[in-house]
A protein has these predicted regions:
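Short, solvent-exposed mixed-charge patches
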Residues: 1, 346-347
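Blade/loop signatures of beta-propeller domains
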Residues: 2-35
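General secondary-structure propensity
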Residues: 2-4, 258, 313, 317
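Repeat-blade elements of multi-bladed beta-propeller folds
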Residues: 8-18, 42-64, 79-106, 119-146, ...
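Short, positively charged, low-complexity/disordered linker segments
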Residues: 34-36, 292-316
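A short beta-strand motif characteristic of beta-propeller blades
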Residues: 35-39, 74-79, 114-119, 154-159, ...
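Short loop/turn segments that connect beta-strands within beta-propeller blades
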Residues: 69-73, 109-112, 149-153, 189-193, ...
Length: 347
């Protein structure tokens, strides 16, 4: 896993790393004092920002991947994908990768925006690409899950599942895990794409799994959060919430944090699924949380920082009802995007 060290300016993929654990190791304990800059893009943002060095990368329904200088809030460059983009980009070394509604997945030079390679799926790619072991993994609404070579974009394998895939995968050396609209969670062999196991839930699985230790964690629209054995998919535990879950889990301090459309953020013991606490955020919680050192941050009608042990609100930045993405925390700044197309830098 490529978790950023404290104080570093790297948050290179959805939920921070290829295992999608949402763990930062930073403590954003202070209430942000104000907005350092904000910019409005031409259309809505339905993805999460990622951070690499001094550039913040944001995809948008205007069809562009935007690279924003974090010091000034001005564009460093932007790339026209030719179709709206729901996919959160992923940084791998000098590359940045993303999918789009036209079905293409592209790798660009992250400093310049120059295209390195492009590959086409048969339908939109809303999932964020995940990089592991020199391969790029992603699912598509065409019902296929793809693995391509990181350096060239050449196809490695395709697994056909005949159901739309909007879940972003998590990947480890032992497996690639993702949800599917056929109500199942899958584990594929990274080298071949062979289905190692699949586990049925009661409804669509658009949540992105997180892999930690001997557990894969994921939510389902059947109202439940699941902890599965990564080797065979057997259920360690299942926790029922009041409505469907499209939020992805985050893991830290032996707890898993996950939001539900029943307006609550839940803290559960990773080993047992026992409820530690829940807090009512007064709105449907579809954004994934992120975990700092003793702090959980989540966007829901603004951004909340909660005490990870108790769920008590430490601070809240009220920026409007349109925030349902994933905040990027550096220890000094917080970067946020909203469905109205506004990007915020708080300090």
């Amino acid at each position: 896993m490529n978790q950023p060290a404290s104080g570093s300016a790297e948050w290179g993929s959805l939920l921070g790393d290829s295992a999608r654990t949402g763990g930062l190791g930073l403590k954003p304990a202070r209430d942000p004092k104000g907005i350092r800059w904000r910019i409005r893009l031409a259309k809505s943002v339905r993805s999460a920002p990622v951070l690499g060095g001094d550039l913040l990368y944001v995809t948008c329904l205007d069809g562009y991947l935007h690279a924003i200088d974090t010091k000034t809030g001005r564009h460093a460059w932007k790339f026209n994908a030719g179709a709206p983009i729901h996919s959160t980009p992923s940084i791998s070394g000098a590359k940045i990768l993303f999918g789009c509604d036209g079905g293409q997945v592209r790798a660009l030079e992250r400093d310049s925006g120059r295209k390195i390679w492009e590959i086409a799926a048969g339908a939109e790619v809303w999932a964020s690409p995940v990089v592991q072991g020199g391969k790029v993994f992603f699912g598509s609404a065409d019902g296929n899950f793809y693995a391509v070579d990181l350096e060239t974009g050449a196809g490695e394998w395709v697994q056909t599942l005949m159901a739309r895939i909007y879940s972003t995968a998590c990947a480890t050396a032992g497996g690639v895990y993702f949800g599917c609209s056929d109500n199942r969670i899958y584990c594929l062999e990274p080298s071949s794409g062979k289905v190692v196991w699949s586990k049925a839930s009661g409804s669509v699985v658009d949540s992105s799994p997180a892999a930690t230790g001997d557990t894969v964690l994921v939510g389902s629209e059947d109202f439940a959060a699941y902890a599965l054995d990564p080797a065979n998919g057997s259920v360690h535990w299942k926790f029922e919430t009041g409505l469907g879950i499209s939020s992805s889990p985050a893991v830290g301090g032996g707890m898993v944090f996950i939001g539900s459309k029943d307006h609550h953020l839940y803290a559960l013991d990773v080993r047992t699924g026992k409820l530690g606490w829940k807090v009512n955020l007064q709105t449907s919680v579809t954004a994934p949380p992120v975990v700092g050192e003793g702090v959980v941050c989540i966007q829901a009608d603004g951004v909340f920082a909660l005490d990870a042990a108790t769920g008590k609100v430490i601070w809240r930045a009220a920026l409007g009802r349109s925030l349902q993405s994933v905040p990027v925390l550096t220890g000094r700044e917080i970067y946020l995007t909203g469905i109205e197309g506004i990007i915020y830098a708080l300090e």
